[in-house]
UniProtKB/Swiss-Prot annotation:
It catalyses: Co-precorrin-6B + S-adenosyl-L-methionine = Co-precorrin-7 + S-adenosyl-L-homocysteine + CO2. CDD domains: AdoMet_MTases. One of its GO terms (molecular function) is cobalt-precorrin-6B C5-methyltransferase activity. This is Probable cobalt-precorrin-6B C(15)-methyltransferase (decarboxylating). S-adenosyl-L-methionine binds at T16, G40, C41, G42, S43, G44, D61, A89. SUPFAM superfamilies: S-adenosyl-L-methionine-dependent methyltransferases. The keyword Transport does not apply. Pathway: Cofactor biosynthesis; adenosylcobalamin biosynthesis; cob(II)yrinate a,c-diamide from sirohydrochlorin (anaerobic route): step 8/10. It holds the Pfam family Methyltransf_31. InterPro entries: CbiT, Cbl_synth_MTase_CbiT, Cobalamin_biosynth_MTase, Methyltranfer_dom, SAM-dependent_MTases_sf. GO terms for biological process: anaerobic cobalamin biosynthetic process; methylation. It comes from Methanococcus maripaludis (strain DSM 14266 / JCM 13030 / NBRC 101832 / S2 / LL). Its EC number is 2.1.1.196. It comes from the Archaea.
C-alpha cells in the first residue's frame, strides 16, 4: 500500500486512508483481468491502488476538484490504465463495461445499486461512515438478492506523549461487500 503522505492532496477532497484501502482492496478480491468502476473516487487513492492490481479502472466523481486530484495522483504514480470522468454515477455507469465496483462515496446510492444489479456486477464493495447509510445499503443489497458481508474497521495511530504512548482513533469505517448469489 502507498502511504497516505505520498498522495497529492487538495483541501476538501477526501482520501480513503491506507489501512482502509488495504481491507477494501482485499474485499474486492482483485484479479489481473478485472475491470473496476471506482464511484466517488475522491483523491484517487483507491483508483491508484486498484490499477496496480487489475486490468483497467474507470473512476467517477461529481466534483471537479476530486477529478483533478485523482488525475494528479494517477500521473504521480505513473498509472496509465485508468480514466477519470466528471459527473453523476447513475448517468455514467452505462458508458463503461466492468465486472467489479468500489464505491467510496456517492449520492443516490440505492438507484446506483439498482443499475449495477441490472448489469450483473459480480462484486461490489462500499465504504461508509454514517451508520444509517450502512443499514440502508445492506438492506438494499439484500432486497436486490445479493450475498452481503460487512465489517466495521477502526484504525488508531500511535503517538508519543511525555509520559508514554497513546492511541488516537480515526472514524470507524463500515466496509460492505456484496456478491451475486
Amino acid at each position: 500500500m502507498i502511504q497516505d503522505s505520498e498522495f497529492f492532496r487538495m483541501e476538501g477532497v477526501p482520501i480513503t486512508k491506507e489501512e482502509i484501502r488495504a481491507v477494501s482492496i482485499g474485499k474486492l478480491n482483485l484479479d489481473p483481468e478485472d475491470v473496476v468502476l471506482d464511484i466517488g473516487c475522491g483523491s484517487g487513492g483507491m483508483s491508484v491502488e486498484i490499477s496496480k492490481r487489475s486490468k483497467f479502472v474507470y473512476s467517477i466523481d461529481n466534483s471537479e476538484d476530486a477529478k483533478n486530484t485523482t488525475l494528479n495522483n494517477l500521473k504521480k504514480f505513473n498509472v496509465e490504465n485508468c480514466t477519470v470522468s466528471l459527473g453523476n454515477a447513475e448517468d455514467l455507469i452505462s458508458k463503461f463495461d466492468f465486472n467489479k465496483v468500489f464505491i467510496g462515496g456517492t449520492q443516490n446510492i440505492e438507484q446506483i445499486l439498482e443499475i449495477l444489479k441490472e448489469k450483473n456486477i459480480e462484486r461490489i464493495v462500499v465504504n461508509t461512515i454514517v451508520l444509517e447509510n450502512s443499514v440502508k445499503i445492506i438492506n438494499k443489497f439484500e432486497e436486490l438478492g445479493y450475498n452481503v458481508d460487512f465489517v466495521n474497521v477502526s484504525v488508531s495511530y500511535g503517538k508519543k506523549i511525555n509520559s508514554g504512548h497513546i492511541m488516537l482513533s480515526k472514524n470507524p469505517i463500515t466496509i460492505i461487500t456484496a456478491t451475486l448469489k
